[in-house]
């Protein structure tokens, strides 16, 4: 008997099957409707920065406590898409934190994504990660304050209007690297400004007094501290950065009020360790940013002023760790306030400054998402491709060597000791090759390790410049920074675990005791 709808039995079977198929399809439909409603309800519960703060974003300077409150709100309402990480406090006890956002599926697997990405630093680990990791850093200079406002708008738009980008991308947003400096500026401005604000640059609200909000509590420029990590904000942030090792890092800044917006590609000189891919992708990011700026009729420039050389900036340090590191500069700064007339007579408003940073940030996430696989492949290649083997040898006073070893530990750079031996080595102090005898007390740093390119940058004696016009510092060699004797050799040395010498405070039992009155 053939079961088909033209036989009595087949027809009955067909009717039953059609009925249950209809029930099944209705159930599936209801499930998707329910899922969509749940997601939509979560999105609807998430307030925009303007709705949450009670004023349109960019019409006031938000205090750091308000920024904290908004990110807590985002974390609570979008908990399946967001992780909020508190990583420390400033000298003035303001919280330091960042948000990790992505799709629900990615957040559920976020630890695996993080560890898979870090496997690029292990020569023997071949785990594969196909998610792009983009880190956005705001307001390292406190009075370049529009970017913190933009961080709130950026996280809101990524979770609502551009959630598609989060399917294959993890975005890390640190809304304020320098809360002490930023609150110093915001509090001064809020106390000084008129209502409505005055756009005349000679008015008091455009005359930020010393010490200003640029620096942190100890008036240290945190954008010169990525390598040296002398400040507590930098120390805590570096520890978190090394847990993620992003593929793209953007450092948001502000510049003079008459300048158009600046984004990548950077100006020459580029350091020689920067790869062709890192150069090329800067151009790709710049073109994508330019597309949106052109659509809005916003002025911008590239390849001028801001180079990629000195290793202690928020663009170069990530670059020497395999990322596409970039500085974005918006017109503004401490002089701009809520609005100011520039030399062309145009009103530069905080509202517009926030828009520019927001669009540039989301554009960067967009192009990174579109190239997530290539970003991962090239990130792995950055750490595994090493053309030369150089070993650096350090000796000197114990306290100076100890300081150097702490520096290396903080950057997770491997260092060792070795047995006594003689070899030919280049002397940093004498600037020539000499015969040198290694001792067991010497500290030895090979560049044939995952962070070997960063080692080469830190150790170079003479900076190689493709252009004599540089933005800032041109010398930073570690032997001279720490006042130790430095040597380098191309010979591979048998390495042993480094053992720090313990300090022995000996008491002379025969010493004559005396008392002073």
Regions picked out by a protein language model, each given a short descriptive name:
Residues 174-292:
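Hydrophobic, small-residue-rich alpha-helical packing segments that form membrane-like cores
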Residues 44-145, 149-170, 224, 230-232, ...:
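Intrinsic-disorder/low-complexity accessory segments
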Residues 26-34:
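Sec-dependent signal peptide recognition
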């Amino acid at each position: 008997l053939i079961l088909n709808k033209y036989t009595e039995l087949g027809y009955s079977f067909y009717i039953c099957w059609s009925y249950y198929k209809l029930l099944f399809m209705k159930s599936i439909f209801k499930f998707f409707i329910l899922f969509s409603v749940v997601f939509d309800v979560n999105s609807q519960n998430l307030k925009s920065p303007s709705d949450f703060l009670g004023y349109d974003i960019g019409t006031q300077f938000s205090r750091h406590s308000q920024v904290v409150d908004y990110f807590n709100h985002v974390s609570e309402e979008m908990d399946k898409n967001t992780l909020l990480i508190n990583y420390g406090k400033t000298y003035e006890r303001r919280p330091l934190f960042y948000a990790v956002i992505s799709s629900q599926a990615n957040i559920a697997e976020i630890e695996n994504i993080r560890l898979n990405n870090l496997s690029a630093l292990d020569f023997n680990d071949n785990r594969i990660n196909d998610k792009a990791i983009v880190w956005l850093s705001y307001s390292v200079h406190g009075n370049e304050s529009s970017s913190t406002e933009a961080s709130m708008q950026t996280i809101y738009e990524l979770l609502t209007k551009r959630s598609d980008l989060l399917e294959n991308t993890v975005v890390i947003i640190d809304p304020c690297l320098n809360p002490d400096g930023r609150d110093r500026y915001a509090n001064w401005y809020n106390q000084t400004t008129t209502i409505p604000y005055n756009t005349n640059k000679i008015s008091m609200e455009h005359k930020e007094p010393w010490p200003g909000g640029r620096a942190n509590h100890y008036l240290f420029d945190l954008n010169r501290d990525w390598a040296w990590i002398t400040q507590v904000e930098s120390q805590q942030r570096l520890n978190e950065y090394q847990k993620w090792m992003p593929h793209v890092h953007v450092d948001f800044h502000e510049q003079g009020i008459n300048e158009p917006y600046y984004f990548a590609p950077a100006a020459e000189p580029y350091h020689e360790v920067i790869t062709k891919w890192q150069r090329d992708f800067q151009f790709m990011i710049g073109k994508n940013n330019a597309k949106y700026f052109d659509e809005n009729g916003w002025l911008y420039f590239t390849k001028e002023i801001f180079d990629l050389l000195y290793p202690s900036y928020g663009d170069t340090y990530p670059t020497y760790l395999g990322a596409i590191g970039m500085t974005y500069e918006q017109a503004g700064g401490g002089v701009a306030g809520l609005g100011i007339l520039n030399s062309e007579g145009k009103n530069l408003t905080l509202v517009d400054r926030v828009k520019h940073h927001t669009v540039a940030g989301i554009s960067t996430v967009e192009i990174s998402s579109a190239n997530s696989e290539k970003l991962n492949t090239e990130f792995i290649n950055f750490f595994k491709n090493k053309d030369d083997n150089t070993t650096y040898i350090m000796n000197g006073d114990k306290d100076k060597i100890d300081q150097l070893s702490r520096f290396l530990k903080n950057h997770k750079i491997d260092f060792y000791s070795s047995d006594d031996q003689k070899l030919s080595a280049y002397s940093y102090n004498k600037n020539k090759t000499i015969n040198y005898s290694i001792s067991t007390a010497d500290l030895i740093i090979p560049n044939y390790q995952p962070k070997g390119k960063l080692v080469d940058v830190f150790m170079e004696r003479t900076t190689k410049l493709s252009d004599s016009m540089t933005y800032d510092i041109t010398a930073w060699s570690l032997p001279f920074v720490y006042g130790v004797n430095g040597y380098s050799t191309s010979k591979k040395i048998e390495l042993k675990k480094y053992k720090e010498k313990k300090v022995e405070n000996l008491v002379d039992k025969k010493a004559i005791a005396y008392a002073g009155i």
